[in-house]
Amino acid sequence: MSHKLTILPFLIKFTPKFPQSIDHDEHGLNVYAFDLDHTIIKPKSPNISFSRSASDWQFINFNSKKSTLDYLCNIIDNDPTAVIVIFSNQGGVITVPRTSKSCTKYTNKILLFLKAIKNDERGETLSHRLWLYAAPKRPKTFAANHSKITFASLGESYNNDPNIFEKVRKPMTGMVEFFKRDLESAYRVSEQISPIKLNWIYYCGDAAGRKKDFSDSDIKFAENLHVEFKYPEEIFHG
């Protein structure tokens, strides 16, 4: 398995077990950020919005020549300081308990997604520079007035404000804070060195408030990050 899976009540993340060494020096890392569903992948089953099973997905072809996977590999091939991160809202997934049907389906889906990338002839490098974060639904066991949650996996007592589930969900930017911390852990040599500079190239997603879109969470997310927003057709159609 190329990635470490971490499941928290309010966040699911897949981080590279062996991040590729990147010579980022003072110029920092170039961050290419994406949504997942209907941006990079879509269900194989026709005329549905959400996958019916963990294997019911495919990379999207916005043109007849290349898939979204091809474009992601091109980014890595052409930019030696690139990292790719996926931020996804998963309102149909509940992580308490971790063995819930929806959580198991989603995590198995991402494991198959990562396996498909690694099995591609150009995917090995991409897999070591790919980070994935998902914001699940607030479970009923965590009421809005829940004041404190202890996360053994983080080695800390998280004095949670009552809106933590909403703050990690797009268009809020809470997932980004976890991504930044994980990057620091992966690439920062010591605490004495300045934090890694992140150059946000763009955020690409399909929820842009158009008539055909189900929401505007992606374009608002980019606005809250002060990052240029791109439609999938702009990135994957060239």
UniProtKB/Swiss-Prot annotation:
Entry EC no(s): 3.1.3.32
Enzyme class: hydrolase
Superkingdom of this protein's organism: Eukaryota
Molecular function as annotated in GO: ATP-dependent polydeoxyribonucleotide 5'-hydroxyl-kinase activity; double-stranded DNA binding; polynucleotide 3'-phosphatase activity
Catalytic reaction list: a 3'end (2'-deoxyribonucleotide 3'-phosphate)-DNA + H2O = a 3'-end 2'-deoxyribonucleotide-DNA + phosphate
Keyword Ion transport applies: no
InterPro entries assigned to the protein according to its UniProt record, in alphabetical order: HAD-like_sf (IPR036412), HAD_sf (IPR023214), PNK3P (IPR013954), Polynucleotide_phosphatase (IPR006551)
UniProt GO cellular component terms: nucleus
Compartments it resides in: Nucleus
GO terms under biological process: DNA repair; double-strand break repair
Keywords: DNA damage, DNA repair, Hydrolase, Nucleus
Principal location listed in the UniProt entry: nucleus
Function statement: Dephosphorylate DNA's 3'-phosphate termini. Has a role in the repair of breaks in single-stranded DNA.
The family this protein is said to belong to: Belongs to the DNA 3' phosphatase family.
Protein name per the record: Polynucleotide 3'-phosphatase
Record lineage: Eukaryota, Fungi, Dikarya, Ascomycota, Saccharomycotina
Designated gene of the protein: TPP1
